[in-house]
Amino acid sequence: MFGSKRLKNVKEAFKSLKGQNSETPIENSKASFKSKNSKTSTISKDAKSSSSLKIPISSNNKNKIFSLAETNKYGMSSKPIAAAFDFTQNLLAIATVTGEVHIYGQQQVEVVIKLEDRSAIKEMRFVKGIYLVVINAKDTVYVLSLYSQKVLTTVFVPGKITSIDTDASLDWMLIGLQNGSMIVYDIDRDQLSSFKLDNLQKSSFFPAARLSPIVSIQWNPRDIGTVLISYEYVTLTYSLVENEIKQSFIYELPPFAPGGDFSEKTNEKRTPKVIQSLYHPNSLHIITIHEDNSLVFWDANSGHMIMARTVFETEINVPQPDYIRDSSTNAAKISKVYWMCENNPEYTSLLISHKSISRGDNQSLTMIDLGYTPRYSITSYEGMKNYYANPKQMKIFPLPTNVPIVNILPIPRQSPYFAGCHNPGLILLILGNGEIETMLYPSGIFTDKASLFPQNLSWLRPLATTSMAASVPNKLWLGALSAAQNKDYLLKGGVRTKRQKLPAEYGTAFITGHSNGSVRIYDASHGDIQDNASFEVNLSRTLNKAKELAVDKISFAAETLELAVSIETGDVVLFKYEVNQFYSVENRPESGDLEMNFRRFSLNNTNGVLVDVRDRAPTGVRQGFMPSTAVHANKGKTSAINNSNIGFVGIAYAAGSLMLIDRRGPAIIYMENIREISGAQSACVTCIEFVIMEYGDDGYSSILMVCGTDMGEVITYKILPASGGKFDVQLMDITNVTSKGPIHKIDAFSKETKSSCLATIPKMQNLSKGLCIPGIVLITGFDDIRLITLGKSKSTHKGFKYPLAATGLSYISTVEKNNDRKNLTVIITLEINGHLRVFTIPDFKEQMSEHIPFPIAAKYITESSVLRNGDIAIRVSEFQASLFSTVKEQDTLAPVSDTLYINGIRIPYRPQVNSLQWARGTVYCTPAQLNELLGGVNRPASKYKESIIAEGSFSERSSDDNNANHPEHQYTKPTRKGRNSSYGVLRNVSRAVETRWDAVEDRFNDYATAMGETMNEAVEQTGKDVMKGALGF
């Protein structure tokens, strides 16, 4: 009568999982990842259980049972500010404002390196596949080893660093200084080169001008013997081999030339300052970017200016006396430009980042698709001018937020060269508030798909607005996780080190809600799960809206795998774990789904409170948390929600309304404003809990909905069975429990066994047997805890010095000296100052008192959760949470570290000059010659073993790039291979994501691309052979 069919349905949902992924071992979900000096926490089951997988602990001295230890971290300790990607090892490094470097690899691979100086990091570069060079805000250079995962050396540069460049295959870092000098640092030998350039702008071009810093440096993408250097007023190419300036580029605007800014002062000569310069991937052209938004294209060999333009205007360097520009309209200033290329480096585009015009305005990115570059040898300057003046297409990508961009990182798919812009499929954007956005390129679609990156980055993509943790029965949890395996993760590098695990009866689910309406559910002890197993639901799709989606409350029914989520507008969506009836292999709506598409309108167009949204399930997910019902009550913001384990959902609103929903209908079985209840002094309900226990002296147990209010009152309702399988709700009592502010948490336990009295389906089924469970309700107020008996006046009180952030009951299984098993029920409290204590109940005897060993933001600590196994998940800050254990283990587990560097992966062959440049006299400089040139004949041997380890990882020719063991790291010379020749593994990833987000991108003429590559290479090789024969090379 009480829904035994429901339990059967839950079991049926997992039958399909038994034969699925049977070859993939799914391990227990309890974490063993630990910080130094920490001990792994223990898992126990409800005290009612007669058996336990718990490691025995003597309970003769309870003080020896409890000990605080951090067992895992999630997210980052502070705001991310810089990023770098290593194509060779396929690793992503993200640095924070407090000097931490997080290096991520495949699935859950992560290594954190903390620098001694806690200053913000401003730049990072991977070098030779084994080094990571880090520069902080104090211009200190750190060299980190991916092999040993340590800081190898610290370098103090003689001056302020204004620009750097490195190359994935070279030992050297070019450093531009504030005084205009360029020095060279030998990363492998840890020494500065004797080679140094003074301020060339002052010595060779503008001796009267003030001292200019170097604003931009770049290695020639085809010739390591040449570098591109920009000062404020001159850009030049410099030959390291010949030790001389090869060509100079000075952008001057004659009178009446409009230029790139919107100034009216066009009647005089101007020289806009340079902010950046870049080589075309073929090294034959360069672009200089100026502070007035001018984009100036030059012939790198002759120094001829080909075209000066802005994003929207051309020939801005030509005098136009009658030109009128609206000076009241301000153009967004260019902050940085990236010269992208596809698989064939002759097909290029510009990605331009703009600053916001005024504070609070949205930033945007602009893509100028230039298409295939005309052949240099047969195209006139006029032809090249037309090429740059008439791009194939232009796209503007507005950011979904008005937060400024602080760092942009293209993720290349083809090679680490061309400044990391070789066929990128994804662009990583770090915003000023620490949020990370990911944009597919060249489509410009923004995606927050959680499985692309490790789970610890989920806190930042986008920012988490709320979080919670819950204990889930392990068999149920592992079965669900097996359906959540995601194979579309972007990073492939590193090796996850196997963690030792302890037997566990319960797993821990961590749930985060985000500003874009997404909710992620993942295993909090992912040290035992090798995959990116996570669930993701998106309220934007379900509610068909794009704004006001920030998630503010989440309730998770762990034993029935149901979810209730509310957003800032007060809309609530109910989800349940099940097979998706709308799943499509093609990931596209079927032709007969026209009616479903018509129903995808906003909830504002609906009159009912409960809206069926099952047809809004994502078509690309076979099994997971599917939307079932949206609650559109128009009652304002929610103040509390609770999705019980017996099918009832309680929703309270800040305006005072209280609603009870039976999910089985669904149906609203109760709705009333508590402000209208006689005797109630409160304005709204602040927490809801469902318990099964005796009320007063009834002599039998009932389903009770217990509500705490903002004025410290407890309102109790009985949920009674009615005819036709329905339920009635009866108000029983209103009790004033505390006078200090709102009630934050309600829990309940049995007087006799101390086991939990929270409502579950097995307890619900036993109601028909007349079982009577005398229980005690635990009420957490502002700074006190009270134990009350519903329907009676008896209570016990415990006060605290500081406000309470989180409380909860835990059930610890212990073993006596005579090997008798005993269950210990305790209450764990966390005060807002980070003080954590453990008490026995109901006598409140203190068993442990410890402080969390690091600062915790008071704004976020209230999102902490006490788990039933003695763990507590604490949200430390906006970007991080930690899992602590309060139970001391007999066996301590040694901390382990993941492997980052994989030996044997070859660094791709660096592109070289083409036949025309060769014939014109360009001297190709080999890496060995460059080492001798910059390091001298007596260059010392490397002081690091990393140098020896990485020595054989360089490809001497393009055919060496192939590595059968690591196909995702290949870099292959373009050949005729058919339609998919330009596809890498990351391209497939990005295209899969585009499909999943219902955004089908054009194929960009793959066949034409492949044919173009083949023909270009054939002509290039033929010309090279002819020249070599004719000139005697």
Curated annotation (Swiss-Prot):
Q: In which compartments does the protein localize?
A: Cytoplasm; Cell membrane
Provide the Gene Ontology terms for cellular component.
cytoplasm; cytosol; mating projection tip; plasma membrane
Which Gene3D superfamilies does the entry link to? YVTN repeat-like/Quinoprotein amine dehydrogenase
On the tree of life, the source organism's domain of life is Eukaryota
Q: Where is the composition biased (Low complexity)?
A: 28-45
* Region of interest: Disordered: 16-45, 953-984
Q: Which GO terms describe its biological process?
A: establishment of cell polarity; exocytosis; Golgi to plasma membrane transport; small GTPase-mediated signal transduction
As given in the record, the signal peptide range reads: none
Tell me the residues on which Phosphoserine occurs: S591, S602
Q: Which SUPFAM superfamilies match?
A: WD40 repeat-like
In residue terms, where are the WD repeats?
Answer: 81-114, 121-156, 161-197, 216-249, 274-309, 333-397, 405-440, 464-538, 552-631, 638-673, 685-736, 745-799, 804-851, 865-888
| A Pfam entry, by short name | Lgl_C
**Keywords for the protein's UniProt record, in alphabetical order:** Cell membrane, Cytoplasm, Exocytosis, Membrane, Phosphoprotein, Repeat, WD repeat
- What segments bear the compositional bias annotation Polar residues? 18-27
Q: How does it sit in the membrane?
A: Peripheral membrane protein
A GO MF label: syntaxin binding
Query: What is the role of the protein in this entry?
Result: Acts as an allosteric regulator of polarized exocytosis by promoting the targeted fusion of vesicles with the plasma membrane. Coordinates the spatial and temporal nature of both Rab-dependent tethering and SNARE-dependent membrane fusion of exocytic vesicles with the plasma membrane. Required for targeting of the sodium pumping ATPase ENA1 to the Cell Surface, thus being involved in maintenance of ion homeostasis in cells exposed to NaCl stress. May be involved in the targeting of the myosin proteins to their intrinsic pathways. Multicopy suppressor of RHO3.
Q: Which family does the record assign?
A: Belongs to the WD repeat L(2)GL family.
Complex and partners: Interacts with MYO2 and SEC9.
This chain belongs to the protein called: Lethal(2) giant larvae protein homolog SRO7
Which organism is the protein's source?
Answer: Saccharomyces cerevisiae (strain ATCC 204508 / S288c)
The lineage is: Eukaryota, Fungi, Dikarya, Ascomycota, Saccharomycotina
Gene name per UniProt: SRO7
